[in-house]
């Protein structure tokens, strides 16, 4: 036994040169002791843990390996939030991190403070949303898919609460315990209902901590689950019948509120009750109507995505013009268009950004160049057509009747690439 311990001490005191070496040492240790007996040697366990921290820290905690696919707004705009909070002299509503003017500047931008604009929307609409939340009313954002409702709710929650992590994703499988609270069943069986056994869900956490809770796609949630919000929105209290005493009721702290989103295309799937509708102020988020604004947004957003993907080239302006013009020509924006002109697919600005990103990636990875009209034809088909044969015919008709009439070089190159359509 002593000999084995000496061998182990000798092994763990030699620092491995790489994380792979760490696993080799663990394998050597396991040859001398069973796992349970090995971990009883506390000095060995501490040494292994120390080696793990030292040699895995640089590899797995470095910026190169800690890139998030989509950083939350609180991380992405941390410097702007800190600057706004430092310069914020206006009074804040109870429980808010920023005042209303500062929250407005965070969303719409402020050139004087070098704060970027994060969404294209009417300033008056943002002001109405902030006032609604400041008065304690729930806020519901409705609109066509891809109109930045989720982004807007994230920005609002970040400006008010400092983060937007308390999010409920609505769907047919969403249950009440995913919204309010659940239980650690091991503790529940051993010790019975208690606050230690309770597992808080986003709504419980938001009420407890005084933060904004986001409820995405609320109309896709079953009606009986939607109605569990009634008490929280009216009386601001959540009852936990399994507990007794003060723990059986959770009263919302200042700052708590709910921002819900709903797509107009989901209307009728799970229609909200009249009682729940009364507890929300509804704000409609419209598509971007101005061509120049939409083009600018697609250009900036796609450039950011391409940089995140390690692509050194932006999509050329001419290709972006083709993309945005195609989307605007084929989408139903309330303009006078027949069913022969518009597609059933969601031709949103968000989809246009995704297509622009795909064009840049395709051109650089496959051809080592910037995007061209032919790349756009390849990438646009999967977004527009999907599995609808009528949309496929409409897209081909659009190329023959609309694209062919443009005489500019990039439009003609776009037309000549029509044979790439599926």
Question: Which residues are covered by each model-predicted region?
Answer:
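Low-complexity, intrinsically disordered or signal/transmembrane-proximal segments
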Residues: 3-6, 25, 32, 37, ...
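Positively charged N-terminal leader segments that act as targeting/secretion signals
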Residues: 11-24, 38-48
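Accessory N-terminal regulatory regions that flank AAA+/P-loop NTPase motors
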Residues: 43, 49-52, 62-89, 407-422
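AAA+ P-loop NTPase catalytic core and its hallmark functional loops
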Residues: 62-309
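Amphipathic alpha-helical interaction segments
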Residues: 136, 163, 190, 283, ...
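Conserved AAA+ ATPase small/helical "lid" subdomain
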Residues: 302-370
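C-terminal engagement/docking regions of AAA+ P-loop ATPases
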Residues: 364-422
